[in-house]
Amino acid sequence: MKLNQFGAAIGLLATGALLSGCGSDNNAAVGSARTGPSSGQVSCGGKPTLKASGSTAQANAMTRFVNAFERSCPGQTLNYTANGSGAGVSEFNGNQTDFGGSDSPLSRKEYAAAEQRCGSQAWNLPVVFGPIAITYNVNGLSSLNLDGPTTAKIFNGSIASWNDPAIQALNTGVALPAEPIHVVFRNDESGTTDNFQRYLDVASNGEWGKGIGKTFKGGVGEGAKGNDGTSAAVKSTEGSITYNEWSFASARKLNTAKIATSADPEPIAISVDSVGKTISGATIIGEGNDLVLDTVSFYKPAQPGSYPIVLATYEIVCSKYPDAQVGRAVKAFLQSTIGGGQNGLGDNGYVPIPDSFKSRLSTAANAIA
């Protein structure tokens, strides 16, 4: 097994976009799984060593997935480079890897390139679900409440001090310091950034105003590469704030903000339960086995107790690979990921695939050739 981050070995290491290459007018709830083969079946064989790259958000999960693959299929493994969603898509489309990991589904332009690379339809298969944490480092501040509008104004520079009245109003009775806010953002193309900016765009009641995309558009702060880089920067910088995939926040023991939503003015902390409530309401907008999720409901949840900043990481695969041996191995990897690879994900800051969705996902994985 070889797991890389920015080209180096890693030890510690999960959407929504509205745009998909293949849209469907027939939305299906995540819970309305179609009948499919058992998620416990793994058909081993094919290419001995797969190569993949992309999302840093799923890097910790990939450790478990590769271990599950190796246990299920002795003699087979996967080398994964966690170099960001943008790189994962471009390397897959450039035929440098066997599949890519992305925290956003393929855009129409990316989908066209993927279809050319595959010689068949490309599919977006969400196998990792995880919250994006807003992490901060302020001396003496162990608890922080935020909401969409206030968070947006912090990350576009409209709020520049920790004792700003808007932050104080959400943290009654808390002594906030009169010190500047140091924003840290991802300086690589990032699906985490894309999802975070989509949250700000949807949940800020117009306060964001900077647009969306894989490149940070806030116009304020200092950049760092990957979830690892941003979490390390906040850990070492007094007065700083950033957005991280939860497993990195947990690994570095960073303070995380609670988030108030339109469904629940009581600020909600990240937990497996609060994120599970959020993803239970997601619908599939992709067509057939292209399982793109419509996650606008994540950002403005209807159910109280839902944590709103959640991403799904997609494995970008060919429905039919030019090399059947690659297709067979990718199928086996995904089968083991959907099965035994889900065990213990909660310990790493992820939410396991809901049982009601496993059948739908297994149907897609088993159709890969």
Curated annotation (Swiss-Prot):
Membrane topology: Lipid-anchor
Any GO MF annotation of the entry: phosphate ion binding
Key words of the record: Cell membrane, Lipoprotein, Membrane, Palmitate, Phosphate transport, Signal, Transport
Annotated lipid attachment (N-palmitoyl cysteine): 22
Signal sequence, renumbered to the chain: 1-21
SUPFAM superfamilies listed in its UniProt record: Periplasmic binding protein-like II
Main location: membrane
Residues that coordinate or bind phosphate: 55-57, 85, 103, 190-192
InterPro entries documented for this protein: ABC_phos-bd_PstS, PBP_domain, Phosphate-bind_PstS
A GO cellular component annotation in the UniProt record: ATP-binding cassette (ABC) transporter complex
Any GO BP annotation: phosphate ion transmembrane transport
Coiled coil spans: none
Covalent lipid adducts (S-diacylglycerol cysteine), residues: 22
Listed Gene3D superfamilies: Periplasmic binding protein-like II (3.40.190.10)
Compartmental location: Cell membrane
Pfam families: PBP_like_2
Subunit structure: The complex is composed of two ATP-binding proteins (PstB), two transmembrane proteins (PstC and PstA) and a solute-binding protein (PstS).
Protein function: Part of the ABC transporter complex PstSACB involved in phosphate import.
Family affiliation: Belongs to the PstS family.
Protein name: Phosphate-binding protein PstS 3
Protein's organism: Mycobacterium leprae (strain TN)
Source taxonomy: Bacteria, Bacillati, Actinomycetota, Actinomycetes, Mycobacteriales
